[in-house]
Amino acid sequence: MKRIKFGLATQIFVGLILGVIVGVIWYGNPALPTYLQPIGDLFLRLIKMIVIPIVVSSLIIGVAGAGNGKQVGKLGFRTILYFEIITTFAIILGLALANIFHPGTGVNIHEAQKSDISQYVETEKEQSNKSVAETFLHIVPTNFFQSLVEGDLLAIICFTVLFALGISAIGERGKPVLAFFEGVSHAMFHVVNLVMKVAPFGVFALIGVTVSKFGLGSLISLGKLVGLVYVALAFFLIVIFGIVAKIAGISIFKFLAYMKDEILLAFSTSSSETVLPRIMEKMEKIGCPKGIVSFVIPIGYTFNLDGSVLYQSIAALFLAQVYGIDLTIWHQITLVLVLMVTSKGMAAVPGTSFVVLLATLGTIGVPAEGLAFIAGVDRIMDMARTVVNLTGNALAAVVMSKWEGMFNPAKAETVMSQSKTEQNATISG
């Protein structure tokens, strides 16, 4: 009798369901997080441990192999341009849906559980004191090793790109250095596969803690907001990304099926970082050049948070409607412009979505205290927007590869179809 092997997606789904069941049974029990939180934190720490080495080694291999700085500069300009266009679409879609469905009308926000947001207020104050020039100046590190310790991804990318260009410029003398980082890259992707073996346990622990703390009751008073956010994110995922994928020559449904393991893991953990290494590996498998993948995806984690900005635009109008504040078209245009800036400038800040909302609400006259009432359901919405964020960045690698004339859609479709067949065969044993 053949041994039945379950794929990673199935294992994670089982962990997710068991976590929900345990969280519901022990809802409000302070002892549960004491036992489960360390397990979830351990899994997240294992992932964060390998993200920076993978980004650095992959970026060096990709950029040094790409050649001159002119090519890298062109790719950088096109990437940022694409990110700005797609995130602007997300903001406008969020505002349009909030205006049509009015999720905040008739909601008594005081029925919702109030949460502590003081940490986000302090972070917002720190960030608001920085000028736009200071924000962009921060991209260039004064000490690369300090940036590594702090996990400052933009500063790390800046140094790594320059270092890779230096390796490329010295020709033969740079080959041993390049070979070293190729070895690092291969080794780290092997470590990723090892870490993924404990992913179902991490998901079980994280979901169990979340449900035990917030329960399902908080969904009732803020159900309209949560429902609209999920509908909006699903629309963006299928329709907007579907159009982008079609232009790139692939099917969005095959693309999503190809990434189902990563999508389920990101949804369960509310963390894009947990799947960054696997997303990079999978985009290379469907034909995206390593240089483009290692450049576009890490930068996208800072500049291309489509799910987050879509949520932020809906949440801002939701709070305005709750407080009975009528926002004119000019207020909403201001909101679009402010979100376009703040969502980029604060992308590496902990609790980004809340910090961005705090920075934005004041510009349109909406009381920031309202965020304390929606904080209780933020984790539930964060799960969905994380999926859109990671899908957007994976798709961006495909778009940039296509734009550079280095992507074969037919080959990609074949690889994605083969992958689905192999996964099904694994599950059926």
From Swiss-Prot:
Protein's GO biological process: amino acid transport; dicarboxylic acid transport
Organism: Bacillus subtilis (strain 168)
Keywords, in A-Z order: Amino-acid transport, Cell membrane, Membrane, Symport, Transmembrane, Transmembrane helix, Transport
Gene3D superfamilies, sorted: Sodium:dicarboxylate symporter
Transmembrane helix in keyword set: yes
Transmembrane annotation, as ranges: 6-26, 46-66, 80-100, 151-171, 191-211, 225-245, 247-267, 291-311, 322-342, 354-374
Subcellular location: Cell membrane; Membrane raft
A Pfam family hit: SDF
Lineage per the UniProt record: Bacteria, Bacillati, Bacillota, Bacilli, Bacillales
The protein's name: Proton/sodium-glutamate symport protein
Gene name per UniProt: gltT
Description of what induces expression: In the presence of glutamate in the medium, the expression is reduced two-fold, at high potassium concentration (5 mM). In the absence of glutamate, the expression is about two-fold increased at the increased potassium concentration.
Family stated for the protein in its record: Belongs to the dicarboxylate/amino acid:cation symporter (DAACS) (TC 2.A.23) family.
Membrane-related topology note: Multi-pass membrane protein
Extracellular topological segments: 27-45, 101-150, 212-224, 268-290, 343-353
Gene Ontology CC: one annotated term: plasma membrane
PANTHER family cross-referenced by the UniProt entry: PROTON/GLUTAMATE-ASPARTATE SYMPORTER, PROTON_GLUTAMATE-ASPARTATE SYMPORTER
Membrane topology, Cytoplasmic segments: 1-5, 67-79, 172-190, 246, 312-321, 375-429
